[in-house]
Amino acid sequence: MARHEDLRGQVAIVTGASSGVGWQSALRLAEAGVKLCVTARRQSALEQLRVEVLQRGGECLVSDGDVTVAEDVERVVRECVAHYGRVDLLVNAAAVQSYGDFDQLPWEHITRVFDVNCFGYFRFARAVLPHFKKQGHGHLLNIQSMLAAGSAPLLSAYAASKHATLGWAQSLELELHGTGIQVSNVLVPSVSTPMFDHAPTMLGKKPVPVPPTYDVDLVARAVVRLAKRPGRTSVPAFLQGRLMLWLNGLAPSVGKAVLSRFGARMQTTDVPLDRPEGNLFTPVEQGVGPRGSVPPTPAWKRFSATLGLAALTGGVVGGAVLGTRGLLRAVR
C-alpha cells in the first residue's frame, strides 16, 4: 500500500463540491497542499469555494458540470489535465437522495438517484483511469455511506445505489491490483450537510438525517487521511460505526426490528414541506457550503448512543458465546 504523507503538489478532482462533504473535503485537501479542480452543477457556488481555497493559500480550478452527462465529465478531466498537467486523485462526492416509500417514489427519481450516486462515480472513474494508467499511479476515493452496508426505510433508492457503488469499488480494487492505482472508500454516517435541505420528499414533511448526526468535517478529515494512506475503507465515526456494522453482521434482526418500527419516524418532522423535486434535476440556489440546517447531535448524546450500542452488541456476543457453549456441551 503506497503512502503519501506529504500531499503537497498532488492534483485532485473533487465532484459534488458546491456543498456538503465535497466542499469541506476540498478545503481540507487544499490545506494539505493539494491542487484542486472542483466540479458541480452550480458554478456560482464553486466560485465561492474557490475564494475560500485561495484565502487559505491553495490553488483551485473551477470546472462546472453534471456527473450524469458524459461530455461534462470528460471535459472536466480534460480541463484539469490541461491546467495542471496531470491528475493524481479523484474524490467522488456527488450525491442526491429522494425520501418516500418505494412505491411512492417516481420512477424517474429512482433512476436519477442511481445516475448520480452510482453511474456518476463510474463516469468519472472511466475518465481518469486512462490518465492514472499512463502515469502508473492514481487514487480513486469514493464517498460512500453507512447505508452501503445497511438499510433504512424511506431511502430505498439511495441505499441501493450505495450498495451498488461499494460493490463496484471493491471489484475495481481487485482489477487494479498491482497497477499502482489505489481505491479507497469512506463509509459516511449521518452528517450535517445541505443534502437534507435539497432532497425531494414524497412525505409532505421536512426530512432529517437518521440520528446521531456528525459534523461534516469528520468526513473531510477522513478523506485527507485516506489521501495520505490509500487503499482502505474508512469508517469516520469509528466506534459507533464499527459497532453498528458488527451488530448488523451478528444480529441483523435487531437492527431490522428497530428501524422497521422507528426508522421512518426518526427521519421526519412535523414541519410541513412541499418539495417534490428538490435538486434532483435542477440545481437549487440555497444550501451552499459545507453545513446544512440540521445541527450535529451533541457529543454527550452520541456518547450515550455509543454506550447503548456497545451494551447491545456485547449482549448479542455474550448470548452467542453462551449458545455455542451449550451446543458444544449437548453434542459431546
Predicted regions and their residues:
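Conserved glycine-rich cofactor-binding loop
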Residues: 11, 18-19
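Conserved glycine-rich Rossmann-like NAD(P)H-binding loop of the short-chain dehydrogenase/reductase
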Residues: 34-49
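The beta1-alpha1 cofactor-binding region of Rossmann-like NAD(H)/NADP(H)-dependent oxidoreductases
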Residues: 64-75, 107
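Conserved NAD(P)H cofactor-binding loop of Rossmann-fold oxidoreductase domains
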Residues: 93-98
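Substrate-binding pocket helix/loop in short-chain dehydrogenase/reductase
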Residues: 101-102, 109-111
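Active-site helix of classical SDR
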Residues: 125, 161
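SDR active-site lid
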Residues: 178-270
